[in-house]
């Protein structure tokens, strides 16, 4: 909302749109003004909407993305035509691949100019078609009620995702006094699964001797976190989670084996590879989770439950397909399994032994700050309901491995697209969504610089985001792969000319300090979390540190590296000893 002593906005399309957004429950939106979207910004002056002026449109899209992830509400971003719209694209694609509900509004040249290569004209409808659930080029103000209602419904229904409304300037300026008051859209939950499919799933699970629950991001998307916890508590079935499923079970839950896949736990990967049944809940067999798909869970039948029927059998054929409401299906399973099955006791014991035997160790040799230990301590010191956002790179995997999440929405990470620069604007959006909670960003020196301009937004809004910046003066994950798989032929990964991040933060008016020694970690983290406003902790780490364990590309999860392959490779046994 902006204060003004000037005239009220006319009853035009732009004004109608701001009122419709208010009716849909939108309170905060992120954007950057420009020529073709100026009527909308004029209407904002008389609106209750809180507009956050970012410093780059990609920041707007990613902030709306983070807002939606943290709040389970629709994120809204706004940009002008041409470069403004194209700058949104990465954030929109990230939302599409991670199933994040967003409504993206772009200005467009006036309808008589469409197709004339007018100044800042861009076919954003065509440009975004592969990365949205639906898009509209609104050619008449009379279409606005239908378009807005459909946009918010489609963004939220079924498998959530982004939609885009491309709004020509003359449509924004057109008289809208005759349009009806907007009625908020309603969303029907996914249908309940067929009873026959549920019965088949129950029978398969009851017959299994070595079942594993494989939980993905669909648990949170389907509001089924508590349903999953109740089911696992009752059945005591060992459970693994994907990157975006982390937190579906608390990290300290006795039946949680942690994350599976390329950088997952040995216990999780061993359990999956040895299992005779996978109960797949809201997961999609992503390559980072499965490793070499043909050798993934080679002995297991698959029961696949998902709200998105198109995901079932897309990559791994399901023996039992259960499309529909995930929470409904889990509750049915819970009713069928009120207590653990005795014939699965040996399996539970074996998985528990793996969990204990292969628990992460934090006593790494050397003097450098050990990032896994530091992140574990950060997770312990931060409030239990803290939101931890991260960027993409080695630190992203360390966060997934060593931070403890009590709910999937406490963990904001760019899973499918792997967007460097995601973290800072996403944390910003999360802080607006959760003003009374601690929001921490863990970033790396490579990712941080990609959207560093949003420090200005955080400072201006006095958002109390806490930033832990891990600095190894390189593109760490690229360097690690060049070390392991490209014969240590290092190419274009040196960031030793990074700026002074403490001085940089202070220029923006953000409190900042640097630590270099292990003895400084406790005090540095405590001071960071105690800051009342935004703050940055610059952490120097070993430039040669790698993320372990690691499943090499195009290999089975039964093969995990614990160190440079020039030294040794350890393989996971595939069967329980008799």
Annotated model-derived regions:
Residues 1-8, 142, 178-180, 208, ...:
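Phosphate/pyrophosphate-binding active-site segments
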Residues 14-17, 22, 32-35, 40-42, ...:
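Active-site diphosphate/adenylate-binding microenvironment
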Residues 14-26, 66-72, 96, 154-159, ...:
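Glycine-rich phosphate/diphosphate-binding loops that line cofactor/substrate pockets in enzymes
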Residues 38-111, 113-120, 267-286, 312-323, 327-333, 397-475, ...:
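Thiamine diphosphate
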Residues 69, 217-303, 405-437, 449-453, ...:
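Glycine-rich, anion-gripping cofactor-binding loops and their flanking helix/strand elements
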Residues 106-147, 152, 245-349:
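Glycine-rich, acidic loop regions that bind phosphate or pyrophosphate groups
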Residues 122, 150, 154-207, 560-562:
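Conformationally flexible catalytic loops at phosphate/diphosphate-handling active centers
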């Amino acid at each position: 909302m902006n204060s003004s002593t000037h005239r009220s906005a006319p009853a035009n399309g732009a004004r109608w749109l701001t009122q419709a957004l208010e009716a849909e429950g939108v309170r905060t939106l992120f954007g950057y003004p420009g020529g073709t979207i100026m009527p909308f910004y004029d209407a904002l002056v008389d609106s209750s909407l809180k507009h956050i002026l970012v410093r780059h449109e990609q920041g707007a899209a990613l902030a709306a993305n983070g807002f939606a992830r943290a709040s389970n509400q629709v994120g809204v971003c706004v940009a002008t035509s041409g470069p403004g719209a194209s700058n949104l694209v990465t954030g929109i694609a990230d939302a599409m691949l991670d199933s994040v509900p967003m409504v993206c509004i772009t200005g467009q040249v006036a309808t008589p100019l469409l197709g004339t290569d007018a100044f800042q004209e861009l076919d954003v409808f065509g440009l975004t078609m592969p990365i949205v659930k639906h898009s509209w080029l609104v050619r008449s103000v009379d279409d606005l009620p239908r378009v807005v209602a459909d946009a918010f419904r489609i963004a939220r229904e079924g498998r959530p995702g982004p939609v885009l409304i491309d709004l020509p300037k003359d449509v924004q300026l057109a008289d809208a006094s005759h349009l009806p008051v907007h009625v908020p859209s309603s969303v029907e939950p996914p249908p309940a699964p067929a009873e026959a499919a549920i019965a088949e799933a129950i029978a398969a699970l009851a017959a299994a001797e070595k079942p594993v629950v494989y939980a993905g991001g669909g648990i949170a998307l389907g509001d089924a976190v508590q349903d999953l916890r109740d089911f696992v508590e009752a059945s005591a079935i060992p459970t693994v989670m994907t990157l975006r499923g982390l937190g579906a079970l608390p990290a300290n839950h006795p039946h949680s084996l942690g994350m599976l896949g390329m950088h997952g736990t040995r216990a999780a990967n061993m359990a999956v590879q040895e299992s005779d049944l996978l109960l797949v809940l809201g997961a999609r067999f992503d390559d980072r989770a499965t490793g070499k798909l043909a050798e993934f869970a080679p002995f297991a039948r698959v029961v696949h439950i998902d709200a998105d029927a198109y995901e079932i059998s897309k990559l791994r054929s399901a023996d039992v397909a259960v499309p529909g409401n995930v929470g409904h299906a889990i509750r049915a399973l819970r009713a069928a399994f009120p207590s653990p099955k005795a014939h699965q006791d040996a399996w539970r014991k074996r998985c528990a032994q793996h969990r204990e035997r292969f628990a992460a160790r934090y006593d790494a040799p050397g003097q450098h700050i050990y990032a896994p230990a530091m992140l574990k301590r950060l997770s312990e010191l931060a409030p239990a309901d803290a939101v931890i956002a991260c960027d993409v790179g080695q630190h992203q995997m360390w966060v997934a491995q060593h931070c403890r999440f009590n709910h999937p929405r406490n963990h904001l990470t760019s899973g499918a697209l792997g967007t460097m620069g995601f973290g800072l604007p996403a944390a910003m959006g999360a802080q607006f969504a959760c003003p009374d909670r601690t929001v921490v960003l863990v970033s790396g020196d490579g990712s941080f610089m990609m959207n560093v301009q949003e420090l200005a937004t955080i400072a201006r809004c006095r958002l109390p985001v806490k930033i832990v910046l891990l600095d190894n003066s390189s593109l760490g994950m690229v360097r690690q792969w060049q070390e392991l798989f490209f014969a240590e032929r290092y190419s274009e990964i040196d960031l030793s000319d990074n700026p002074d991040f403490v001085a940089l933060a202070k220029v923006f008016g953000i409190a900042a300090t640097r630590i270099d020694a292990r003895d400084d970690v406790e005090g540095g983290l405590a001071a960071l979390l105690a800051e009342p406003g935004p703050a940055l902790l610059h952490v120097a780490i070993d430039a040669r540190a790698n993320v372990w364990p690691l499943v090499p590309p195009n290999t089975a999860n039964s093969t995990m590296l614990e160190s440079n392959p020039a030294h040794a490779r350890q393989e996971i046994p595939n069967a329980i000893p008799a």
